[in-house]
Amino acid sequence: MPSVITVTSDDLALPLEQHVAQVAAALDAHGHVVALAPAEADDAARRRLHTVRSALEADRLAIVPLGLPPLARVLLGEQLRQLTGTDLGPGVLAGAARLLSYYLHSGALLGSVSKLDRVPVGVGSHVKSLVPGRHFAVLAHPEPYIGEAEPAAVPPGPGYMTQLALAGKGLDPGWITGPLAAAWRSQHVREVPLPPDSARWWGTGKLVEFTAYIADVGMLYQLVTSVRRDTCTWCGLEVIGDQCLFCATRLGDRNAPAKHAADPRGRSVETPRRPQLEPHKR
């Protein structure tokens, strides 16, 4: 059963040798590890994980960069850990990280946007953030949105059933648990610990981060299995998408036999016209 981890700045508190030992133990116990990392190539925690991967010479560790806010990455890791209990293999799970990110709606309630650089901020919002008592509703994924947090002003949400998670400190979460949860028709609202990278990501320590996500493992499984699978021509893992996230092989020649694995069940697959990580365009 593969293991799924979420890369955070807390990983940097570990000595490199200890970090290497932890990942090695996870690989020994689970066979494969899927690590969800920040999208920024210069992120210190992500660079550390690449160092660990190189030290172990581990092609069973997939580092998946995602341009998601910290809470969304944590919840995506939770979703993938649910799916590890199904019959999905490690290559499919790694690709599912990108696929399922389409179904996350993530933002934050902020007391100031003066240092926010993840979402375009207009001059008017910068000026308003200087006024005490102003709260801003910001959506970073899937589409950027910024506005004052008012009962009648709610960013567009998911068009399907989700649960809502929130995490934060320093601000009243009433706008999230009230108008936002009602407008997004959230089935359940729960509070979780604030991820260690949230304050840096959002540019302020006074925030309440929120994410709408699909909690039903059956629905998650259906979404993942609705995408066509292929077999990596190098390592032989079954994957979704146009690249194996473990060995980084691009699946350009879909009909070539795997070099390091047995015949993938004799299936014949047609060459797709586009990558398969865009579920709404299949």
Walk through the language-model features, giving the residues of each.
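Cys/His-clustered metal-coordination modules, chiefly Zn-binding fingers
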Residues: 169-282
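Surface-exposed beta-strand edges and their flanking turn/coil or helix-capping segments
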Residues: 19-20, 48-50, 76-79, 247, ...
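Long, charged N-terminal interaction/targeting segments
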Residues: 48-215
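Long, leucine/valine-rich, helix-dominated scaffolding and oligomerization segments
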Residues: 1-50, 54-58
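Residue-identity detector for glutamine
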Residues: 18, 22, 60, 79-82, ...
